[in-house]
UniProtKB/Swiss-Prot annotation:
This is Histidine ammonia-lyase. It catalyses: L-histidine = trans-urocanate + NH4(+). Its EC number is 4.3.1.3. InterPro entries: Aromatic_Lyase, Fumarase/histidase_N, HutH, L-Aspartase-like, Phe/His_NH3-lyase_AS. It comes from Salmonella agona (strain SL483). GO terms for molecular function: histidine ammonia-lyase activity. Pathway: Amino-acid degradation; L-histidine degradation into L-glutamate; N-formimidoyl-L-glutamate from L-histidine: step 1/3. CDD domains: PAL-HAL.
Length: 506
């Protein structure tokens, strides 16, 4: 199990990916402790001096004008968690819950939240013990923070609700006991600090980004394979073309294609003197389209990495000035817009792949047997596999609708503009699954097309891609049950079988 020292505000994308993919043992950087303690001292001073400060000794939302008596402050924080745990939907998986918890710890440990070190350490203990709170997927509008999902997370700290430990759902009290942990009692401001923040929205979108990176790499490899299968030209990847335009994503994608295709291959030599002048756009414009997608991936990375390291609590404690200031860092609009842009990229990666599949089906365009199978008529070959890819591409067009332009006022119009970032991030998972299915069909089709070139081979890297598939899925000599082959190719893609052939591009 990986051990990670968490320096608040300095998580890298690779660290976040590791947290999502694997259980982790966290250690808090000791340099963070003074800032955490100073923010708590500031909150305690406000209470002791009888000053009124939102979230410390007031109600919440529209009830912010209601002053809470000192003797009720602890109960106020507990009541906040219980009442706000109002989510619906399916439970999030352990990987997503773990990522949300680490993001929450990272934010709280920045020292602007007025939450005791002991509570942060209790969250770290949950991560290290593998105790995963039951967080329901739906119920947040991404402002004021991800209240419902983070309340469900916080229930476990209180010994309420349910949690999963070693794969079993248990009452939270039982899960804590089995893991050797104890519930905590929250002090002033701590319930609000736990609930306010964009950590669920950010985690949802980060998963979308991680999957989009794999899809992008896989699609570039399959696009190169298809270029070979249909006797496409290498000329459109010439560096001079892309330098003349100056779009960095496009320049970098063309370089990836040159890396995969190399200068030539046996397939390329076989049609070196052909009379074709230009390839269809789905081949020729791959650097332009995929380059635009890469730019979106890179911009999304910047936004999400900043948000993963952000303080998105409210109010914020500025201990050096002895002030608590209300603001709006909980509003997840940056995450929502980043997720919307990422959705466009995921949809386009799949759409371009589907067009290349369709190209291979057409004997006039591909110079291959119709639907990539001999004895057509008796055999239907890839006919319906292409229809499946088209269906998935069409679904993604609807799913790519922007969420950040939607808003419904909540909390009696106190919270009158919201981001819808959780939904924006969560739909990326379905889009990624759809696009992975499309790319799986293209991988199958492109390898079949190269097989039909009667022993001609492609570049070394593309032959690796073909061999990886052929170790699991045989060449089609006649029709057979097709769905298991798509499932197998999809699983290989999810494992990064093609991603490892592509140099780092982020």
């Amino acid at each position: 199990m990986n051990t990670m020292t968490l320096t608040p505000g300095q998580l890298s994308l690779s660290q976040l990916y590791d947290v999502w993919r694997h259980p982790v043992q966290l250690r808090l950087d000791a340099n963070a402790i003074d800032g955490i303690n100073a923010s708590v001292a500031c909150v305690n001073d406000i209470v002791a001096e009888g000053r009124t400060a939102y979230g410390i000794n007031t109600g919440f939302g529209l009830l912010a004008q209601t002053r809470i008596a000192d003797e009720d402050l602890q109960n106020l924080q507990r009541s906040l968690v219980l009442s706000h745990a109002a989510g619906v939907g399916d439970p999030l998986d352990d990987a997503m819950v773990r990522l949300i918890m680490v993001l929450k710890i990272n934010s709280l440990a920045r020292g602007f939240s007025g939450i005791r070190l002991s509570v942060i350490e209790a969250l770290i203990a949950l991560v290290n013990a593998g105790v995963y709170p039951l967080i329901l997927a739906k119920g947040s509008v991404g402002a004021s923070g991800d209240l419902a999902p983070l309340a469900h997370l916080s229930l476990t700290l209180l010994g309420e609700g349910k949690a999963r430990w070693q794969g079993e759902w248990l009452p939270a009290q039982t899960a804590l006991k089995k893991a050797g942990l104890e519930p905590v009692a929250l002090a002033a401001k701590e319930g609000l600090a736990l609930l306010n923040g964009t950590q669920a929205s950010t985690a949802f979108a980060l998963r979308g980004l991680f999957e989009a990176q794999e899809l992008f790499a896989s699609a570039v490899v399959c696009g190169a394979l298809t270029t070979e299968a249909v006797l496409g030209s290498r000329r459109p990847f010439d560096a001079r073309i892309h330098a003349a335009r100056g779009q960095q994503g496009q320049i970098d994608v063309a370089r990836l294609f040159r890396h995969l295709l190399t200068d030539t291959s046996a397939i390329a030599e076989s049609h070196h003197h052909c009379h074709k002048v230009q390839d269809p756009y789905s081949l020729r414009c791959q650097p332009q389209v995929m380059g635009a997608c890469l730019t979106q991936l890179r911009q999304t990375k910047e936004v999400l990495l900043a948000e993963a390291n952000a303080v998105s609590d409210n109010p914020l404690v500025f201990a050096d000035a002895g002030e608590v200031i209300s603001g709006g860092n909980f509003h997840a609009e940056p995450v929502a817009m980043a997720a919307d842009n990422l959705a466009l990229a995921i949809a386009e990666i799949g759409a371009l792949s589907e067009r290349r599949i369709a190209l291979m089906m057409d004997k006039h365009m591909s110079q291959l047997p119709p639907f990539l199978v001999k004895n057509g008529g008796v055999n239907s070959g890839f006919m319906i596999a292409q229809v499946t890819a088209a269906a998935l591409a069409s679904e993604n067009k609807a799913l790519a609708h922007p969420h950040s332009v939607d808003s419904l006022p909540t909390s009696a119009n106190q919270e009158d503009h919201v981001s819808m970032a959780p939904a924006a991030g969560r739909r990326l998972w379905e889009m990624a699954a759809n696009t992975r299915g499309i790319i799986a069909v293209e991988w199958l089709a492109a390898c079949q097309g190269i097989d039909l070139r009667e022993g001609l081979t492609s570049s070394p890297l593309l032959e690796q891609a073909r061999q990886t598939l052929r170790e699991q899925v045989a060449h089609y000599t006649q029709d057979r049950f097709f769905a298991p082959d798509i499932e197998c190719a999809t699983a290989l893609l999810a494992q990064g079988a093609l991603q490892r052939l592509v140099p780092d591009f982020m």
